[in-house]
Swiss-Prot record:
Function: Converts N-acetylmannosamine-6-phosphate (ManNAc-6-P) to N-acetylglucosamine-6-phosphate (GlcNAc-6-P).
Pathway it works in: Amino-sugar metabolism; N-acetylneuraminate degradation; D-fructose 6-phosphate from N-acetylneuraminate: step 2/5; Amino-sugar metabolism; N-acetylneuraminate degradation; D-fructose 6-phosphate from N-acetylneuraminate: step 3/5
Signal peptide: none
Amino-acid biosynthesis listed as a keyword: no
Organism from which the protein derives: Brucella suis biovar 1 (strain 1330)
Underlying gene: nanEK
Name this protein carries in UniProt: Bifunctional enzyme NanE/NanK
Region (ManNAc kinase): 242-525
InterPro entries reported for this sequence: Aldolase_TIM, ATPase_NBD, NanE, RibuloseP-bd_barrel, ROK
Length: 525
């Protein structure tokens, strides 16, 4: 057959026809768990027929009897293989020439062989040559790029990444080897991605990485594995998780708590120590939770300012002076003896309100309006921290003030309201301004309306840029009596499409500590 030009043309035509049928398509591996209730010819054929009816374009079948029955029952091209457990070789897939013969006689259009560089009874090149001699398509199951090159040099028609992760002595990886797919895609041969493709997303990623087709097995035809995945997920979720040790460090007070989900199991409050970042400062905060050691495995800190990786720094030094490039997570981790996640307090509060509060599951922006103005953004179930850790920091946006451009929080925060009151001849803090407005003082109401107007313009711009489903307002100023009504009134001067759905926060002052604990328990774990 090898020497006949007519036969060579026929084989080449068959190769082109089959690879064209498989290009950009799904191949289903119908290989039951050994000795399972489905480990019989009838079940394999049933799997194959169901796969074909559901749109699969190829089948991967183990065992000559299964191949023969499937080839009779299905119109799809069959990749055939025989698995053996050998005493003197780790190679399992089609290790002998007689295996190749049996698969060809059974009707396999493609014969798969282990082409890894390991001790074996028959060289891979001989197996590939025998497949070609018998007029079938040779598929080489490899684990490395070098093995793929060697298989192609030996005449393989198709490369499969089947063996990646299965030839070493370490644990089998959880995810498929997309890097190997990308490297092998540059070799120019027909490439089938195979091995641990357990979700539609992973199969799609394989095609985008350069695969011509994808084999999926366990996720479709091994109910024992699928049941185990769901069982583990359900039982894991049902187990009470260890609480997270969470801190919310502010300019004036620090809260420590043990948190599980949205439940604060225990809490303690102290005045934030002076000398931010010093050894005594770290020690004082860590001592707040000293007798909780052993009750948590992770810790998390919500802080004002900018958090970029593990570095904490000031966005507005007037709010809290922080040493330059301070590695808060590393310092607190050493003091606590546990891994520590650090996140901006407003971003943590945004996550808390999205998971458990006023904006459950919605695309949202959270704004805390208190002594300063901070914010956080959650879109598509993901907290958006930004390239520099400042996403949502609306208070730092420059706006036009009486004497030039200033930060928004200079005009619309608690500090800003108190400053405007002082300039109008009325000493006191933001709380006293709200009290005066409630008592009918016109000067106080004008200051609050000015602050609400500045905030409304910024919020309308935020709606245009992010377009969230809602904007949640929290913080001492934001939640003060009457302020949200003033904000909504000020937004009335903007077009309807620019007016966001303004929602009051539900978690109050606990949003940050609940959010940062949940991030440590779920998002970063």
């Amino acid at each position: 057959m090898r020497g006949s030009p007519r036969n060579l043309c026929r084989v080449q035509g068959m190769i082109e026809e089959i690879v064209n049928r498989l290009r950009g398509k799904l191949i289903v591996s119908c290989q039951p768990v050994p000795e399972s209730p489905f480990d019989n010819v009838a079940s394999v054929v049933a799997y194959a027929r169901a796969a074909e009816a559901s749109g699969a374009s190829g089948l991967r079948i183990e065992g000559a009897a299964n191949v023969a029955a499937t080839a009779q029952a299905s119109t799809l091209p069959v990749i055939g293989l025989i698995k053996r457990d050998l005493d003197d070789s780790p190679v399992r897939i089609t290790p002998f020439l007689e295996d190749v013969a049996a698969l060809c006689d059974a009707g396999a259009a493609i014969v798969a062989v282990d082409a890894t560089d390991r001790r074996r009874p028959v060289p891979a090149a001989e197996l590939i040559g025998e497949i070609k001699r018998r007029g079938r398509i040779a598929m080489a199951d490899i684990s490395t790029l070098a093995e793929a090159r060697n298989a192609l040099a030996a005449g393989a028609d198709i490369i499969g990444t089947t063996m990646s992760g299965y030839t070493g002595e370490g644990p089998t990886p959880k995810d498929p080897d997309l890097d190997l797919v990308a490297h092998c895609s540059r070799l120019g041969s027909f490439l089938i991605a195979e091995g641990r493709y357990n979700s539609p997303q992973q199969a799609g990623e394989a095609i985008r990485a350069g695969a011509d087709a994808v084999v999926v097995g366990s996720a479709i035809t091994r109910p024992e594995h699928i049941t185990g995945w769901f069982r583990d997920a359900v039982e894991s979720a049902a187990k009470p998780s260890s609480p997270v040790l969470a801190f919310d460090i502010g300019g004036t007070k620090t809260l420590a708590a043990l948190v599980r989900g949205r439940e604060i199991l225990e809490r303690r409050v102290m005045t934030t120590p002076a000398s931010v970042g010093s050894e005594s400062w770290i020690g004082a905060i860590a001592s707040l939770s000293a007798d909780w050691q052993g009750r948590y495995q992770r810790a998390a800190i919500a802080v004002t300012g900018r958090v970029d990786g593990e570095i904490w720094s000031s966005l507005n030094p007037e709010t809290l002076a922080i040493p330059p490039d301070y590695p808060l997570g590393r310092r607190m981790g050493a003091a606590l003896g546990a891994p520590v996640e650090v996140i901006n307090d407003a971003q943590a509060a945004a996550w808390g309100e999205n998971r458990f509060g006023a904006a459950r599951g919605r695309d949202m922006v959270f704004l805390t309006i208190s002594s300063g103005i901070g914010g956080g953004i959650v879109l598509g179930g993901r907290l958006i921290r930004g390239a520099r850790g400042i996403a949502g920091s609306l208070g730092q946006v420059l706006v036009a003030g009486p004497s030039g451009f200033v930060r928004l929080e200079t005009l619309a925060s608690g500090f800003g309201i108190a400053k405007m009151a002082l300039e109008a001849g009325h000493a006191g803090d933001a709380r006293s301004v709200f009290s005066a407005a409630a008592a009918g003082e016109g000067w106080a109401r004008r200051i609050l309306l000015d602050a609400a107007s500045q905030l409304a313009a910024a919020v309308a711009g935020l709606q245009a840029i992010v377009d969230p489903e809602c904007i949640v307002i929290g913080g001492g100023v934001g939640m003060a009596d009457g302020f949200l009504d003033m904000l909504r009134e000020a937004l009335g001067s903007h077009s309807a499409v620019m007016r966001p759905d303004i929602v009051a926060a539900e978690l109050g002052a606990d949003a940050g500590i609940i959010g940062v604990a949940d991030l440590a328990a779920t998002y970063f774990s």
